[in-house]
Amino acid sequence: MASLSQITLPRAPSSEIGLLRRRLERPIIRTRIGFNGRIASVLTNAGDQAVSVKASVSQKVIEEEAKVIVGTYARAPVVLSSGKGCKLFDPEGKEYLDCASGIAVNALGHGDPDWLRAVTEQAGVLAHVSNVYYTIPQIELAKRLVASSFADRVFFCNSGTEANEAAIKFSRKFQRFTHPEDKEVATGFIAFTNSFHGRTLGALALTSKEQYRTPFEPIMPGVTFLEYGNIQAATDLIRSGKIAAVFVEPIQGEGGIYSATKEFLQSLRSACDAAGSLLVFDEVQCGLGRTGLMWAYEAFGVTPDIMTVAKPLAGGLPIGAVLVTEKVAETINYGDHGSTFAGSPLVCSAAIAVMDKVSKPSFLSSVSNKGRYFRDLLVKKLGGNSHVKEVRGEGLIIGVELDVPASSLVDACRDSGLLILTAGKGNVVRIVPPLVISEEEIERAVEIMSQNLTALD
């Protein structure tokens, strides 16, 4: 059999392969154990001897992955080889409607021409030099982030978890800088139930799921988890004077698409101001146009001292950013933090292309309108099912809460050509499509979900 490097992957569905697929009647399920002991099913077609090399590319990729990749992911049995707009294709030409967007990353979908032009042009000029030197795209991107938000300054990194690690360090440095005479300064943190802030040790300590934290203990001490939305408990603990910063997601993504209330965030702001604690908003998933506003915090009338962003910022390339006020920035000195790859000309050029599109009022308005249409259609088509408890969200970050595990519906939809995710305790369907999704694609997504509701029985 040809090696993977010798196989040409198609960029569009093939009628010949489609005909072959229809002729194959009996699926064979192979299984492999993923992380956390989860079993990931691998679907291969009967009649392997009759399947061409091209038609067996996915199977070969899955088999070879198991030999060379550390088993941290329980992957869906799908190999994706190309994409355009909100559509993805496997090597055999099967089409998928992408309502996962790389876990809320591909804001402009796949192959956006302006994004592609920015990346290819910059790659031909200068890709990386490190932060030993100044580069123009980094400064231009920082100016855009500052102009669009509460922030005065920006620190660049490479991911959401890195951004939260930096926010942890900045918070503790702020307390030591502003209380130079104190022998014991505030070093504690508050995080909330259902929170997700990352998987590196500091960010992991702020993440509420015990199954993520337990295998790696001891992790960073000093974190107290409170009920998301509990104003009294948060206010009392902040008043203790031991809290360096409060980390909160205005809308929880991984946690189940739960939105904070305006009263809750305003109370955190007031308590932090009174105690000298910092308020950190994690908008890694809900920020940058996802809610129909440039930043999710705008809906609450509350501004943080620090905000972490990442996922969609560079349209699929790795980036993170920490946005801070001047009072925080002035406490950070040379050498307090850094990153070799952060803010590279290549990635920043990609991010500029994303921001220049997403920040337009007409674009944000379209996200808000499409999100409302999506939710209304979900309520109409799915709301009558006994397993569907609630449809919630803002803009194009949407959750469908069920009274049973969501994985069976997610799997059935995937087999029918729709990619969606789970969230919460596994009972929430998470829908985070590219922000450029069309109404016709929304209708198609809801129709596929509706047709597969029987998988929940």
From Swiss-Prot:
Catalysed reactions listed for this entry: N(2)-acetyl-L-ornithine + 2-oxoglutarate = N-acetyl-L-glutamate 5-semialdehyde + L-glutamate
Record-linked SUPFAM superfamilies: PLP-dependent transferases
Top class in the EC scheme: transferase
GO biological process annotation, one example: L-arginine biosynthetic process
Entry cofactors: pyridoxal 5'-phosphate
Pathway annotation: Amino-acid biosynthesis; L-arginine biosynthesis; N(2)-acetyl-L-ornithine from L-glutamate: step 4/4
Residues carrying N6-(pyridoxal phosphate)lysine: K311
Keyword field: Acetylation, Amino-acid biosynthesis, Aminotransferase, Arginine biosynthesis, Chloroplast, Mitochondrion, Plant defense, Plastid, Pyridoxal phosphate, Transferase, Transit peptide
GO molecular function, one term: pyridoxal phosphate binding
EC number: 2.6.1.11
CDD domains xref list: OAT_like (cd00610)
UniProt family annotation: Belongs to the class-III pyridoxal-phosphate-dependent aminotransferase family.
Database matches in HAMAP family: ArgD_aminotrans_3
NCBIfam families reported in the protein's UniProt record: argD, PRK01278.1
Protein name as annotated: Acetylornithine aminotransferase, chloroplastic/mitochondrial
Organism field: Arabidopsis thaliana (Mouse-ear cress)
Lineage of the organism: Eukaryota, Viridiplantae, Streptophyta, Embryophyta, Tracheophyta
